[in-house]
Amino acid sequence: MRQAKLAAQQRPSEAGFGAQGGDPRRGVDMDLSTCVNRYGPAPAAVEALHSIPPADILLHPYDAAERLVEVYRWATGVNGGAMIAGRGASEFIWAMGRELDHADVQVPLPAYTDYLKAFPGRGFTVSGEQIPTVEQVDAALGAGPLVIVSNPHNPTGTLLNPRELIAVADAHPAATLVVDESYIDFTSHPVGWSTLGCDIPNLVVLQSTSKFYGIAATRAGMAWCADHEQLKRLFGLQENWGLSGVDVHVACAAVRDFRWAAHSRSRMQSDSAWLADVLSGIPGLRPHRNANVHFQYAFCQRAEDVAEIFRNHGIGVRVLGAAHGANPDALRIVAPRSDERERFLGAVADVAAALAASGEAEPAQRA
């Protein structure tokens, strides 16, 4: 029975999703398609990697999971509830893909690629909405026993009110809401915008160190719920020594570096505001401006063509299309650093010229 279930839930084809952010096959040297902090890696992470004791490499990582949970509880101030460590949010997403009946899962659209790969065909929409809302999440919870949504939202950058998410989960006690907070550290107040620490038993939180701390080569994160039985049900039995001791050593050092985190966060917020202004001035783009995270999202009928122009300048941007629930197609672009702006603007000039020459450019407007 178990083998039949797994066979029916094999990893789907990559067709339709395009190259994910950071994929080296893009052939670019300024990769704004991946949402990793461009000011990373955190210096403390690099220092930790250089100074790791030989014994920590020699021996099995017996206490790696415990150390990661300890630093997460320290950083967030959440001491209650059940928390387990894993290899980023990805481990938990794919574990659910193996453990759950896919027919029970709703993924509000548009959505992060891995949700739609782990749960093929489970995209949820009420009326073709393109920007997530709490009302959409509420409707999804009413339609199925489990809903997974990212907050801040990938790919749109929308930030839903955590208290409202808790309230809608509480209103559907027979369903479970999984909130992936992989981008929460990019917000102005990560603890305040998180659902972590709520007292309802049917809300699960995922977090990851990979993106914000600029250490995506390491795989470290956690899952939390007020009810430990939920974690067992969703993720099953974790493997022995599943976490790399080296990854955890690096991740813990990065999380403890509050000063760098605050400085980096401020710089990215400034960069993102600059990018929003630039995109708002390009006819043919319809930006959904946000002040929540380090990337911007814009609808564009010719998103693939625009991405190719950027690629010709050695710049990677992410195209979202029908496979993600985006209609029309859209672009997700991480804000370039201040020292990268001149080169980025050169590509923008070519994009604007190409859209104008095509006759398809419309006056720039905000979503």
Residue ranges and their predicted role:
Residues 269, 281-313, 331, 335:
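Conserved PLP-binding catalytic core of the aspartate aminotransferase-like
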Residues 65-69, 79-103, 221:
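Conserved beta-loop-alpha segment that forms the PLP phosphate-binding cup at the N-terminus of a helix
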Residues 40-42, 202-281, 287-288:
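PLP-dependent aminotransferase class I/II
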Residues 163, 312, 324-367:
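PLP-dependent enzyme catalytic core of the Aspartate aminotransferase-like
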Residues 131-187:
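Active-site phosphate-binding strand-loop segment of PLP-dependent enzymes
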Residues 98-150, 155:
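PLP-dependent aminotransferase-like
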Residues 1-60, 74, 366:
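N-terminal "arm"/small-domain region of PLP-dependent enzymes with the aminotransferase-like
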Residues 43, 302-309, 339-344:
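Short, conserved charged micro-motifs
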